[in-house]
Design a protein with these regions (language model features):
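Proline-centered loop/turn at the N-terminus of a beta-strand
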Residues: 29-31
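Short aromatic-centered micro-motifs
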Residues: 105, 127, 183
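Short glycine-rich anion-binding loops that position phosphate/pyrophosphate groups of nucleotides
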Residues: 15-17, 40, 126-129
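Structural signature of FAD isoalloxazine-binding scaffolds in flavoprotein oxidoreductases
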Residues: 59, 141-145, 149-154, 163-176
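Catalytic core of DAGKc-family lipid kinases
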Residues: 42-118
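N-terminal glycine-/serine-/threonine-rich phosphate-binding loop
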Residues: 1-27, 63
Length: 189
C-alpha cells in the first residue's frame, strides 16, 4: 500500500540489487530503472556515463518499459518473509548430501509429472538465461508470456524442460527420505 504513489524506482547496484527491488514492487507494475554500480549488469543495464540521459528520460517520461513476467509463490509454510515474487526463478532443491527427491508436479490442478531429481526450476523468460539454462533449459524471449519448468539432474533420461503459459498455476508436493530440501526465489532462501 505504501507503493501506490510511486511512479518508478531507481535501483543503484548490480543485478542482485535490482532483484531485491523487484521483491518489494511485486505485482504493482512500478517501473524499475537499474543503474549498474555492481558486478553484473545484465538487468541493471544503465552504466555510469548514461545516468544523466536516463534520469532525463524519466523526468520527461520518454522512456520505454520492458514488461517482464514474474513468478509468485504461495506456500503452506512461511517462506521468504512473505515477499513471494521473483523475476528470475523459483527452485525446489535437495539439501547438501540429501538423497534425490520426488517432486509431484501439477499444472492448473492436473497431474503433470513426478520428477525424481536433485531439484526443479520454474524460470521466467528473464530467468531462462540463468540457472535453468545451465541445466539444459531453453532460452525464452523476455516478452513471451511463459514459464520454463526445468529438472535439475533428473534420474530419467526422457525428462526434458517444458515451456508453459505464465498464467498457469504450478503446484508441487515434495517427497523424500528426509526433509532435506529447500526452496529458493531469485537466490533467496
Amino acid at each position: 500500500d505504501d507503493l501506490q504513489e510511486i511512479d518508478f524506482i531507481i535501483s543503484l547496484g548490480g543485478d542482485g540489487t535490482l532483484l531485491d527491488a523487484v521483491t518489494f514492487v511485486g505485482d504493482k507494475e512500478i517501473p524499475i530503472l537499474g543503474i549498474n554500480y555492481g558486478r553484473l549488469g545484465f538487468l541493471a543495464s544503465i552504466v555510469r556515463d548514461e545516468i544523466h540521459s536516463a534520469i532525463k528520460a524519466l523526468v520527461k517520461r520518454t522512456f520505454m518499459i520492458d514488461k517482464r513476467s514474474l513468478v509468485h509463490l504461495d506456500a503452506n509454510m512461511p517462506l521468504f518473509k512473505g515477499i513471494c515474487y521473483g523475476l528470475n526463478e523459483f527452485t525446489i532443491h535437495k539439501k547438501d548430501t540429501s538423497p534425490m527427491i520426488k517432486i509431484h508436479t501439477y499444472l492448473n490442478g492436473e497431474f503433470l509429472n513426478t520428477y525424481w531429481a536433485d531439484g526443479l526450476i520454474v524460470a521466467t523468460p528473464t530467468g531462462s538465461t540463468g540457472y535453468s539454462l545451465s541445466c539444459n533449459g531453453p532460452v525464452v524471449f523476455p516478452d513471451s508470456a511463459s514459464f520454463v519448468i526445468t529438472p535439475v539432474s533428473p534420474h530419467n533420461l526422457n525428462i526434458r524442460p517444458l515451456v508453459v503459459p505464465d498464467d498457469s498455476v504450478i503446484s508441487f508436493e515434495v517427497e523424500g527420505r528426509t526433509d532435506g530440501f529447500l526452496c529458493t526465489l531469485d537466490s533467496r532462501r
